[in-house]
Amino acid sequence: MNPRRKKRLALVVGLIGGVAAVASLLLYALNTNLNLFYTPTEIAHGKADTGIKPEVGQRIRVGGMVTVGSMIRDPNSLHVEFAVHDAGGGEVIVTYDDLLPDLFREGQGIVAQGVLTEDGKLQASEVLAKHDENYMPPEVAEAMGKNHEKLEYTETQKGGSR
């Protein structure tokens, strides 16, 4: 092989190696920042189409309705623990150590982002509450299906205080 061909071959091999290195670093960075959405049922039983369950320590987002009567607040700190359920009957306990959104309440649709712990709880770093009675994150709406019912108000409630 003459020297000119050797140079071209080395250049092509170097370019391919560089592209492979950049692609692998990019995939690694995306993998560490990727948050997959799960419903409480999918955490327990795996995704319906693949059966894949989230791993302990994996960053995930969980969406569903806050179970009425499940909220436990620590009186000495901001720590709060509550259950989130979905239409499939699944339930996951969420722990959170910060201020909850103003719109947060039991029976409310929420999305919590955090890390799955060994005991099956979600240690949330962020909790998002829906904006009004008409809004629901698309993932939660799909997961909840037809079981999400709009609140019904009486005529007295609709009129407000006069």
Curated annotation (Swiss-Prot):
* Membrane side Periplasmic: residue ranges: 30-162
* Keyword field contains rRNA-binding: no
Mode of membrane association? Single-pass type II membrane protein
**Gene3D superfamilies in the record:** Nucleic acid-binding proteins
What SUPFAM superfamilies does the record tag this protein with? Heme chaperone CcmE
Transmembrane regions:
9-29
| Listed InterPro entries | CcmE, CcmE-like_sf, NA-bd_OB-fold
List of residues binding heme: H131, Y135
| Cellular localisation | Cell inner membrane
| BP-aspect Gene Ontology terms | cytochrome complex assembly
Stored NCBIfam families: PRK13165.1 (NF009638), PRK13254.1-3 (NF009729)
Q: Which HAMAP family match?
A: CcmE (MF_01959)
Family, per the entry? Belongs to the CcmE/CycJ family.
Q: What does this protein do?
A: Heme chaperone required for the biogenesis of c-type cytochromes. Transiently binds heme delivered by CcmC and transfers the heme to apo-cytochromes in a process facilitated by CcmF and CcmH.
Q: What is this protein called?
A: Cytochrome c-type biogenesis protein CcmE
**Organism, scientific name:** Shewanella amazonensis (strain ATCC BAA-1098 / SB2B)
Taxonomic lineage of this organism?
Answer: Bacteria, Pseudomonadati, Pseudomonadota, Gammaproteobacteria, Alteromonadales
